[in-house]
Regions:
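Short edge beta-strand/loop segments characteristic of extracellular beta-sandwich folds
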Residues: 76-84
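N-terminal secretory signal peptides and thylakoid transit peptides that target proteins
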Residues: 1-19
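C-terminal segment of N-terminal export signals and the immediately downstream linker at the start
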Residues: 22-60
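Short acidic/polar inter-strand loop motif in beta-rich domains
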Residues: 139-144
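Beta-strand signatures of extracellular beta-sandwich domains
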Residues: 93-97
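Extracellular Ig-like/FN3 beta-sandwich strand-entry sites
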Residues: 127-131
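Exposed aromatic-hydrophobic patches
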Residues: 119-124
Length: 144
């Protein structure tokens, strides 16, 4: 029996099929550039603007973000103040920052004393795997 000889067309198709996965991987690992590039200066500026001269405390604010999200266009984020809220000291504002997003200030939430609680659930669009930060400012000037 005669063995079929590979044609030029089948060799080119096989070569393209072998080269394609490497190209896709290289594109996936390429750093974001242009308008999608991370903006560390804007991140630092947003942090400094919110904190001011206060020293942030390590406790009192709970941030719940999944380690891996199914959909980067809608990552669920929950933020909650765990300190007791009173009429003299309540949470005025919470911000959520996505460190490697082109616009790092992802969410700004403002509360009044009448809210009774300071918690929220939002969905963020994240440009890539990154650290998400949250800061809260209390009426007394404390930053969490």
């Amino acid at each position: 029996m005669r063995q079929p000889h590979p044609t030029r067309r089948s060799l080119v198709a096989a070569g393209a099929a072998l080269a394609l996965p490497g190209t896709v991987l290289a594109q996936a690992k390429a750093p974001l550039v242009g308008p999608l590039a991370p903006n560390p200066q804007a991140f630092r500026q947003a942090m400094e603007q919110f904190i001011g001269k206060a020293r942030p405390q390590a406790d009192g604010l709970l941030l719940d973000v999944p380690v891996l999200a199914d959909n980067p266009s809608g990552v669920p984020v929950k933020v909650k103040i765990t300190l007791p809220l009173t009429e003299q000291d309540w949470c005025e504002e919470i911000i959520v920052l996505a460190e490697l997003n082109p616009s790092p200030l992802a969410c700004r939430l403002q509360f009044t004393a009448a809210a009774g609680t300071a918690e929220a659930s939002v969905r963020l669009r994240l440009a890539q795997s990154q650290t998400v930060h949250a800061l809260a400012r209390m009426k007394s000037g404390k930053v969490l």
